[in-house]
């Protein structure tokens, strides 16, 4: 668990300090260029350790929104580490980026997943159920992969 930008903004809205989640105060507090920036850079464990931990817990390691956090340059390394899939269809990726990620996933035999990036009441934009769904064939591949992992675990 942690405290994120959205939680701080929620508290500021509740206290009547601002009425806008993503307005001027948000920019002052969370824009790296702002002199009033309160962001503390977190320290993370390495990608390989994360993938190993997910696999150790019986999970499927999927790289979420690869373009949003500039993860694309590391894809070949993540494949070497054993990543299982890539979030191809998501609001933060353009159609061209989605095509590139789908091609990459297929050429490296990775699962191709869709996700809404829905963060509840903290979303900046409107995302409807099904807007970024995983196509049926790719969903079946995910389901089959999950079944294979369960059988392997027994």
Predicted feature locations:
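Conserved acidic, metal-coordinating active-site core of Asp-based
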Residues: 1-62
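Charged catalytic cores and adjacent phosphate/nucleic-acid-binding surfaces used
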Residues: 48-52, 56-60, 67-154
């Amino acid at each position: 668990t942690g405290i994120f930008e959205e939680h701080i903004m929620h508290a500021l809205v509740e206290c009547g300090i601002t009425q806008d989640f993503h307005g001027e105060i948000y920019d002052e507090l969370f824009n790296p260029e702002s002199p009033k920036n309160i962001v503390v850079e977190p320290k993370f464990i390495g990608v390989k350790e994360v993938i190993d931990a997910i696999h150790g817990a019986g999970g499927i390691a999927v790289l979420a929104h690869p373009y949003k956090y500039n993860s694309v340059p590391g894809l070949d390394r993540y494949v070497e580490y054993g990543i299982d899939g890539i979030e191809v269809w998501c609001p933060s990726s353009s159609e061209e980026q989605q095509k590139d990620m789908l091609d990459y996933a297929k050429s490296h035999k990775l699962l191709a997943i869709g996700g809404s990036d829905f963060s509840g009441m903290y979303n900046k934009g409107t995302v409807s159920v099904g807007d970024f769904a995983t196509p049926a064939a790719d969903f079946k591949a995910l389901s089959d992969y999950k079944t294979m992992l369960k059988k392997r675990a027994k």
